[in-house]
Amino acid sequence: MKTSGLLTILLVTLGAVLCADRPDKPHVLFMLIDDLGWQDVVCYDLDEPCPYETPNMDKLSRKGVMFLNGYSPSPVCSPSRGAILSGKHPARTMNTTVASGKPPAPFHRRGNSFIAPWCRGGMDPKEYTITQALKDNGYTTGHVGKWHVAINHHAFPQPVDQGFDFSTHYPKNQMARGVQSGMKNRLANFATKNPKDPYRLDENGYPYDHVTGEALKFLEKSKGSPFFLYYASWLVHSPLQSRSQVLLEKYCKKLGVDYPTDPEGWTLEGQRNPYYCAMVETLDYYIGQMLTLLETTEDPRWPGHKLIENTYIIFTSDNGGMEGHHLEVFTDN
């Protein structure tokens, strides 16, 4: 009789825990990808078959809301990022270009042909960002990856000056760019399985990315409170490179192109750059790592449920794709 009573109490208690209300403040994971084009994701491909493999991005589109008419506030990086964080048009933040005030370079075919209009050297530290608003409402706020809301990556204010409790963006931290830290020769120095290799290949053959690694740590560490994570990947911005030689070889074969022997440039038009293909797939893999953590981790604020069940995930690009420059074709929008 005593055993039965104890069992009843346990069942009632467990039922009460499992039926606990969803927390009022959901978690937020905001993924802002660098220079990803709208046709660089399979789910948005409209004409010829997209060669890139993006199963995790496509999974988000199937399980969420897919927008077809979204427009960036600016065609370049810094103004668009400042606008997204502040909710204001670049003209209002007075940050309208990547670098302002540079004089023309005479007799230089790649130099500026005019002086860009004046703009602020960085976001106004008094600007009330979405991060500060969430922090004021009890959120733990984190940033990993790229910042660039000014004329360069080192200008004031930095993420911690705009409402972030945590940021990996340290100007002198060589690992701050993660897997996108420049390779001196993109046909050499590929990642290995050596434990001492900072880009060591994991069990699935993908290189370690410091940015994503720090994101995963933040998600795990902050799960006990409502969190806002601004995941600002350096992918798929130039330099075009793949630390996985296997991925580079895979896309050369898939595209029917010869494995490159010259590390400089790529002239084939369209979506036929194997370096870029490898970068897009690598990015997708990192997104999958974060989704897996959310899907498999118990939400301490909502017992019996996973983090993914009470997390808003927003996935977008800062300013759309870059088709290339005078030396190299990246992709085709």
Which residues are covered by each model-predicted region?
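Short, solvent-exposed loop/turn and secondary-structure capping segments
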Residues: Q39-L46, S72, P79-G82, M94-V98, ...
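Hydrophobic h-region of N-terminal signal peptides that target proteins for export
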Residues: L10-C19
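Formylglycine-dependent
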Residues: M94-T140, W147-S242, P260-C277
